[in-house]
Amino acid sequence: MSSQAETSQKEDDLKTSGQLGDDIASLFCTSNFDGSDRDYLPEGCLDNLITAENVKCELDKFTEGLHCLKTEDSRRRNRETYTDDFRQELGRWIQNNAPRTFATMVHCDLGPLHLLMSMQKCRDTNFNDQSLPILAPNSMPESWNASIWPRHKLRDFYDKQWKFLAPVFSKYEYHYDCQKNCIFPFTKENVPPRYGAFSTVYKVTVHAKHQKHDSMQAVAIKEIQIIRGDRKTQYDCDVTWDNEARALKSINDIGHDHIVKCIAAIRRGDSRYFMFPWADGDSLRDHWDGVPKRDPDAFTIQEAITQLRGLADALDCLHDCKNRDEIAMETKWKLKTSSQTHLMCKYKMSMTRFPAP
């Protein structure tokens, strides 16, 4: 059973154990895209866990932490402040506004009293899921209590927040600007990467809950080799990547069957990526090498003419593209499976050359 199917099964069978942190961890999936395994929570899983009822059950445990307070007067004031109605109302606010923030704090093992106090501060200052991520491990939000969030706890929150912030790729969005520690919800397929002069292409599967494209199975992630150098070199590389992303977006707008669309242009820290559909048929050269030679017949001749006419029309459309001056097309073609035939597509186009590393 795949990890995605296992997650769905766990969600269907889930009955909270009373240990919310364990219940959340049981739904984690693993991304292997970055060379080492990184856990993330699939989109939508918190909907079944961070309910007002479950949150209140966690907040009700605050009395377990009252013994840490030095005086009986302090313990009494906390009981009077954090009434049942107060915790119920706070639970509803957390469910509607800060489920990711709450889940991250649960995984930081704050203790129930500090968890309650921290979420109260978040509500009072409107620190919610839209405030995530905190951008540095030493960047404590102004409203947070420094005694509850010493440096090591703040670092823990910074590291664990990414588990709940994996991006969702929508057909209505093209540009994605992610923080450097963002976890991609990808599983690398057992296919050797394809290395080019300025890029590496990986075959990956995007978790089903992190993509909103019709019938998108495997995708190609093209990682651009960005030169690490002085500020001007970095700036030039950024401009080059921006130009390529813009040109690919213009090509998408052509909407030609023989031109594979770029699904997404992704920044992650200093790294740059493009996402394309995976071409199942591989390159035309590989196709010829792998298919036994045979004498042409009427069907193959007609199919070849149809494909060549489609490619010629695609090239004509590219010539008329408003960004055609930025396009430097390469002579590599891809075969994309369509029903029981193959559709030849212009797949690999380099908009602008990246300097050699």
Task: Please annotate each region the language model reported.
Residues 279-293:
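Structural motif in protein kinase domains
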Residues 225-257:
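The N-lobe alphaC helix and its flanking beta3-alphaC-beta4 segment of protein kinase-like domains
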Residues 261-272:
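Short beta-strand micro-motifs within the conserved protein kinase catalytic domain, predominantly
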Residues 291-310:
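Activation segment of protein kinase catalytic domains, centered on the conserved DFG
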Residues 220, 273-275:
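Conserved hydrophobic/aromatic residues on the N-lobe beta-strands of protein kinase domains
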Residues 311-318:
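Conserved hydrophobic alpha-helix
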Residues 1-202, 207-218:
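Non-catalytic localization/regulatory regions flanking kinase domains
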Residues 318-356:
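Catalytic-loop of the protein kinase fold
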